[in-house]
């Protein structure tokens, strides 16, 4: 099989089979899988994503579209730098070596990529454009620097976005993340929050789960901002944001973030307060915040209720209020908020009912809307009426106003690492922040770098770091932070339209290809990459780089490939090939020591539950691997790797060769009886497989093609064979299978005597008239209960159906010689005889 696969890969390369023009008269179709990080090797878990995209690309080509199906490399990132530290070599060397190896692997799988458009994000010819784009954002005040409390990963020595903190730990290193103040660069994605939110409803071809995740991440809240005066210091106020200002008469405390500015100004830092602040600083993300037990510590401050000066509320530092949401302060209404209720019970604060409820709010918070009670001038109003009324009062008193808040925060793009795109900024003591002039771009990374594992090597590289200011020529220093790697992947899809464009994009090419018709990748990118790419596209539109404002028309999120995990007696992870099964137990191949089989999980390097691609290719071939990862489960669902599954796919491919040989040896028999059922199945299969592929039901399409192959095999084994239909059916089968298993089908297609390659042939057409059945089966009921079935010819009349079904023995038994009261017909489905 490997010889056949290599033969066709060579032919495709020589014929430039998958290189496409930007000036075709055909309708365009742009299919794209999320570009990979060049980690070194592709395992079979990655193959599924690329196989899905390849089926769609090949199918749409056969449908007559000009298909763009490119590939490139998201090549900056921490693993390369970590490898550089480990091996004392430049990350560039490690990265380019990995790219070479992975490109070879992708080609060996027969994927139909247009390699002439390949991009590499660590190539200065690529990132010089994003450096210029950043400067354009800076000129528009969409990029800025500020001191910010950041998530600091002490192992990777870098800043992490909130999305990159999972359960308080760094998403790559697993280290406990701490809070630290650093000067950081930000992009004003919040300026686009409303459009990003509103446009979600137009993304009709995106999974509902992803749309919902983006809506929640943007997190629009409508409410009010208003001020509480501090008791005994009424010149000073605390501003709060609330989505339920109407519950103001149920307030029992003010909750503030651990880093609220009022703490520095007015709070005496007792050991208890200092310890609590330190504890809060380790809470890094909203997911961890939601899981944490609600706690607080009293500051010693009180505020005065805005509508009743006799009511004072304690100011409490809490672990569930964040400085970067709203104002960093809330008023707590325990009767109507679960978090406030939990804290009130713990700290023995008052719980006052302000919305009518058929429950005891002393025990549980009532979180629904309703009629206001115990609320002075708001009594008797609905929640919405009361909200409008109380905001009006805030505005009259000059202490507050209606406001909108977003959970979405500006995107922190600074990373304190070497292997990333340098931020093109120079810091001058005289001139301040100075953009690198366009003519001096790209700012490239130095080659002579010392990797000792401590911080950012750019900070310790004097000849790179120290430069003259472009404005005043005085000594200055370069910005040593590099871009978050999501910067590169937020615009790469535009570069594929013409990867040799002199500017960031070729506008004409982008107008032809964009938006991407189908984008394929993991759901884990729903609130980072996909949101950032949408944001970049909107800004690129305003900068006249593209005409679209949304990058991806359709999105498909594939399931993961899973495999069992294994550990030895020392709790070390083992590769599957190191384990052998004896009976119902597992043992180490070499030591013969007992091995524990763990959970079936996503394939990952860390847990070693990977299946090596090259080993599988040598054993089964690329086509068998492609077929297996698509056939055993719907593409959007997870797939468990199984040896029996891949073996079954290999047998099916071998069967195709046997079928070809058998059919090739058949002699035409003009007297053979036509197999109408087989002919009908051929046309039905063409129709249904096309529909399945369009709906990404690839496993169902494969099942239909297996059914057709079985029917053809059954016909071949008969004494009298309908040779013409068999040959036609087999030709169709080979065409239908081509997007899934391109190597063997091209080989058989050629042997069948076809001159045109399958990769640029048309998808087979079906004859609508052939789909009509000669007969159909009806269920025969008596008084609504099934008593029999009967096969009728399609030409039968209603009267004939009634006569036949009434005379059936199983029906006569219930009629007992009487005439039916009524006969109800559901055409071609049911006849119901009422007795």
From Swiss-Prot:
Coiled coil: none
Primary localization: cytoplasm
E.C. no: 6.1.1.4
Chain ranges for the short sequence motif 'KMSKS' region as given in the UniProt record: 602-606
Molecular function terms from GO: aminoacyl-tRNA deacylase activity; ATP binding; leucine-tRNA ligase activity
Keywords, ordered alphabetically: Aminoacyl-tRNA synthetase, ATP-binding, Cytoplasm, Ligase, Nucleotide-binding, Protein biosynthesis
Protein name (database record): Leucine--tRNA ligase
Subcellular location(s) per record: Cytoplasm
Reaction(s) the record says it catalyses: tRNA(Leu) + L-leucine + ATP = L-leucyl-tRNA(Leu) + AMP + diphosphate
Motif stretch ('HIGH' region): 36-46
GO CC annotation terms, alphabetical: cytoplasm
């Amino acid at each position: 099989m490997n010889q056949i696969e290599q033969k066709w890969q060579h032919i495709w390369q020589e014929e430039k089979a998958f290189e496409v023009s930007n000036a075709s008269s055909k309708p365009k179709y742009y299919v794209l899988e999320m570009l990979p990080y060049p980690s070194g090797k592709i395992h079979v878990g990655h193959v599924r994503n690329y196989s899905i995209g390849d089926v769609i690309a090949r199918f749409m080509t056969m449908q007559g579209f000009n298909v763009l199906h490119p590939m490139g490399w998201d090549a900056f990132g921490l693993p390369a730098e970590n490898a550089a530290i480990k091996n004392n070599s430049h990350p560039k060397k490690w990265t380019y070596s990995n790219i070479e190896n992975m490109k070879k692997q992708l080609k060996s799988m027969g994927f139909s990529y247009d390699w002439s458009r390949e991009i590499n994000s660590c190539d200065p010819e690529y990132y010089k454009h994003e450096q210029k784009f950043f400067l354009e954002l800076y000129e528009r005040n969409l990029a800025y620097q500020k001191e910010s409390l950041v998530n600091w990963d002490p192992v990777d020595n870098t800043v992490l976005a909130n999305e990159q903190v999972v359960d308080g730990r760094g998403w790559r290193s697993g280290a406990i993340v701490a809070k630290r103040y650093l000067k950081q660069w930000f992009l004003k994605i919040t300026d686009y929050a409303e459009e990003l939110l509103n446009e979600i409803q137009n993304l009709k071809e995106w999974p509902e789960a992803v749309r919902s995740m983006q809506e929640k991440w943007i997190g629009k809240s409508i409410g009010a901002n208003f001020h509480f005066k501090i008791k005994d210091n009424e010149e000073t106020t605390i501003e709060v944001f609330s989505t339920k200002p109407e519950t103001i008469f149920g307030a029992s405390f003010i909750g503030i973030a651990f880093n609220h500015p009022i703490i520095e100004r007015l709070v005496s830092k007792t050991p208890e307060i200092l310890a609590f602040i330190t504890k809060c600083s380790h809470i890094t993300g909203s997911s961890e915040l939601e899981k944490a037990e609600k706690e607080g510590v009293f500051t010693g401050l009180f505020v005065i209720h805005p509508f009743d000066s006799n009511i004072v509320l304690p100011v409490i530092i809490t672990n569930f209020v964040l400085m970067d949401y709203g104002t960093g302060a809330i008023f707590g209404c325990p009767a109507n908020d679960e978090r406030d209720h939990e804290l009130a019970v713990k700290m023995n604060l008052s719980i006052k009912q302000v919305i009518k409820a058929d429950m005891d709010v002393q025990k549980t918070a009532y979180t629904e809307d309703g009629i206001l009670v115990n609320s002075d001038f708001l009594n008797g109003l609905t929640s919405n009426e009361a909200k409008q009324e109380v905001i009006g009062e805030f505005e009259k008193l000059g202490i507050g106003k209606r406001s909108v808040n977003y959970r979405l925060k500006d995107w922190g793009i600074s990373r304190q690492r070497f292997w990333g795109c340098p931020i093109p900024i120079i810091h001058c003591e005289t001139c301040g922040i100075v953009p690198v002039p366009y003519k001096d771009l790209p700012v490239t990374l130095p080659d002579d770098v010392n990797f000792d594992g401590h911080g950012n090597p750019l900070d310790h590289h004097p000849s790179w770091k120290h430069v003259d200011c472009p404005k005043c020529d005085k000594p200055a220093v370069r910005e040593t932070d590099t871009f978050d790697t999501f910067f590169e992947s937020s615009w790469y899809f535009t570069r594929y339209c013409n990867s040799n464009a002199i500017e960031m994009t070729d506008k004409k090419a982008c107008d032809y290809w964009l938006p991407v018709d189908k984008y394929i990748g993991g759901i884990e990118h729903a609130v980072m990459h996909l949101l950032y790419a949408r944001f970049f596209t909107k800004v690129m539109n305003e900068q006249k780089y593209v005409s679209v404002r949304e990058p991806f028309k359709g999105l498909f999120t594939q399931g993961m490939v899973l495999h069992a995990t294994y550990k030895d007696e020392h709790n070390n992870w083992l590769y599957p090939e190191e384990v052998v099964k004896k009976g119902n137990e597992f043992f180490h191949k070499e030591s013969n020591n007992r091995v524990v089989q763990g959970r079936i999980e996503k394939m990952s390097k860390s847990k070693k539950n990977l299946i090596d691609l090259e080993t599988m290719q040598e054993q089964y071939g690329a086509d068998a691997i492609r077929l297996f990862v698509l056939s055993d489960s719907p593409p959007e669902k997870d797939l468990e790797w199984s040896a029996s599954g891949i073996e079954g796919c290999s047998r099916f491919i071998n069967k195709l060769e046997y079928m070809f040989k058998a059919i090739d040896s058949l002699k035409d028999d003009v007297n053979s009886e036509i197999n109408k059922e087989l002919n009908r199945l051929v046309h039905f299969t063409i129709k249904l497989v096309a529909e399945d592929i369009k709906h990404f039901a690839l496993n169902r399409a494969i099942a239909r093609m297996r059914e057709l192959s079985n029917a053809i095999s059954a016909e071949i084994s008969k004494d009298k064979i309908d040779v013409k239909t068999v040959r036609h059916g087999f030709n169709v089968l080979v065409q239908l299978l081509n997007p899934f298993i391109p190597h063997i089908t091209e080989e058989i297609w050629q042997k069948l005597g076809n001159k045109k390659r399958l990769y640029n042939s048309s998808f087979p057409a079906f004859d609508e008239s052939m789909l009509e059945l000669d007969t159909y089966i009806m269920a025969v009921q008596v008084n609504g209960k099934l008593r029999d079935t009967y096969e009728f010819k399609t030409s039968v009349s209603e009267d004939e159906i009634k006569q036949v079904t009434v005379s059936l023995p199983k029906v006569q038994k219930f009629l007992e010689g009487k005439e039916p009261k009524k006969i109800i017909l559901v055409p071609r489905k049911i006849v119901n005889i009422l007795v």
